[in-house]
Curated annotation (Swiss-Prot):
GO molecular function ontology, one term from the record: DNA-binding transcription factor activity
Family as reported in the entry's similarity comment: Belongs to the HSF family.
PANTHER family in UniProt: HEAT SHOCK FACTOR PROTEIN 1 (PTHR10015:SF274), HEAT SHOCK TRANSCRIPTION FACTOR (PTHR10015)
Protein name as catalogued: Heat shock factor protein
GO cellular component, as recorded: nucleus
Cellular localization per UniProt: Nucleus
Cysteines paired by S-S bonds: none
Residue ranges for the DNA-binding region feature of this UniProt entry: 12-117
PROSITE patterns in UniProt: HSF_DOMAIN (PS00434)
Organism lineage string: Eukaryota, Metazoa, Chordata, Craniata, Vertebrata
């Protein structure tokens, strides 16, 4: 028997033909033979089989290669129960089986095919798919990397812009604080400038009607008529609500005056036109007395020149010039001692001609009921000094008004420009103290009106 012979079919692989011959050879039955059923074959003593039989039919004597080829053609190793135990079998027996490898049916060998390496193909396909996926993934990663770099650049730029904005905000806050301080100092400067030139209690010039002076004063901006009188104890004024004659002089607002008539009427001007009465609380200054001034009546000895004494002297002079003495007045002067003048003196703030007409209308010649007094010796000099003082105050007020209206303040503009400079340092201004500007007028007497 030719050990290298092949089976009749040409489609049978050489390994299967050699295997069929090897199993059919009775000389090799001690090492390889069919099973009793004829559907498998047994290999005994693999070491001796590899040394003595394999070199005769194959080009190698490696049992592992022989088993690998069997597995390649679909042969499976049959495992018996006794072989799976812990006790090693006495005989080395390995059984291989294939559905088309049956004793006496050599024609079935054509159906035995070598296994196609589907796993390798599948693996190659999978590898190719994986490579495509990896390539796509790599491209996506690169795209994401580029986007990430762009985002990182934008974030870095935004970070720098944010830092710049914070620095600008800090600078703007400092500038805002600086401007607030500058504005506050400017306001303090303007307020102190205005307060230093302010005169308390002087709102308008008040002309005095003393004697028959030929020099008139300009009418005030807001003219209003007032009447000054002493309130007798026996007379009650329901308008004012004060009946005490010792309350001092009362300034009443003359809102209505009777119209002038050709013939003088007997002095009903006070009763015909009731006027609101204003109580004056005076805190007079102590003027210097003239050595030529004669002593006053006993009632006014304690006060050198009080407001009531000064007004009584003015009223006395007015009554003396308007109402000359008569027989009736002489009789009254003989029977009664001198009393304070109780007539109404019109201290109006209009022109002298209008004042004289009002006085003539209020004090006609036929209505004098009180005798005249002797004029104090130093009255003319006091009146002249008072007129000069009033004119001086009027001139100062006009000058101040022109100064304020003309806006002719001399302000150093360089200091202001330095204040608004972008530098952070704030120059110190030596501004006048607002409280010290009022120190000069703190000693001025204040007349408080209690209505």
């Amino acid at each position: 028997m030719d050990p290298h012979g092949t089976c009749g079919g040409s489609n049978v692989p050489a390994f299967l033909a050699k295997l069929w011959t090897l199993v059919e050879d009775p000389d090799t039955d001690p090492l390889i033979c069919w099973s009793p059923e004829g559907n498998s074959f047994h290999v005994f003593d693999q070491g001796q089989f590899a040394k003595e039989v394999l070199p005769k039919y194959f080009k190698h004597n490696n049992m592992a290669s022989f088993v690998r080829q069997l597995n390649m053609y679909g042969f499976r190793k049959v495992v018996h129960i006794e072989q799976g135990g812990l006790v090693k079998p006495e005989r080395d027996d390995t059984e291989f089986q294939h559905p088309y490898f049956i004793r006496g049916q050599e024609q079935l060998l054509e159906n035995i095919k070598r296994k196609v390496n589907t796993m390798s193909a599948t693996k190659s396909d999978e590898v190719k798919v994986r490579q495509d996926s990896v390539g796509k993934l790599i491209s996506d990663v690169q795209s994401m990397k580029g986007k990430q770099e762009s985002i990182d650049g934008r974030l870095l730029s935004m970070k720098h812009e944010n830092e710049a904005l914070w620095r600008e905000v800090a600078s703007l806050r400092q500038k805002h604080t600086q401007q607030q301080k500058v504005v506050n100092k400017l306001i303090q400067f303007l307020v102190s400038l205005v307060q230093s030139n302010r005169i308390l209690g002087v709102k308008r010039k008040i002309p005095l009607m003393l004697n028959d002076s030929s020099t008139g004063h300009s009418p005030p901006k807001y003219s209003r008529q007032y009447s000054l009188e002493h309130v007798p104890s026996s007379t009650s004024y329901p308008v004012s609500g004060f009946t005490d004659s010792s309350a001092g002089p009362i300034i009443s607002d003359v809102t209505e005056l009777p119209e002038s008539s050709p013939s003088p009427s007997p002095c009903p001007s006070l009763e015909a036109s009731p006027s609101p009465v204003i109580l004056i609380k005076t805190e007079p200054l102590t003027p210097s007395q003239s050595p030529e001034q004669s002593p006053a009546p006993p009632k006014l000895d304690d006060t050198p020149i009080s407001p009531s004494t000064f007004i009584d002297s003015i009223l006395l002079e007015t009554e003396t010039s308007v109402c000359p003495g008569g027989n009736k007045n002489d009789e009254m002067s003989e029977s009664h001692p001198p009393e304070p003048c109780l007539s109404v003196a019109c201290l109006d703030n209009i022109s002298l001609s209008r004042q004289m007409s009002e006085v003539s209308r209020l004090f006609p010649t036929s209505c004098s009921s009180v005798p005249g007094r002797a004029e104090p010796p130093g009255l003319d000099m006091a009146v002249a000094e008072l007129n000069d003082h009033v004119d001086n105050i009027d001139f100062n007020l006009d000058t101040l008004q022109n100064l304020l209206n003309g806006q002719s303040f001399s302000v150093d503009t360089s200091a202001l420009m330095d204040l608004f400079s972008p530098s952070l340092g704030i120059p110190d201004l030596s501004l006048p103290d607002p409280d010290s500007s009022l120190a000069s007028v703190s000693s001025t007497p204040i007349y408080t009106c209690v209505v």
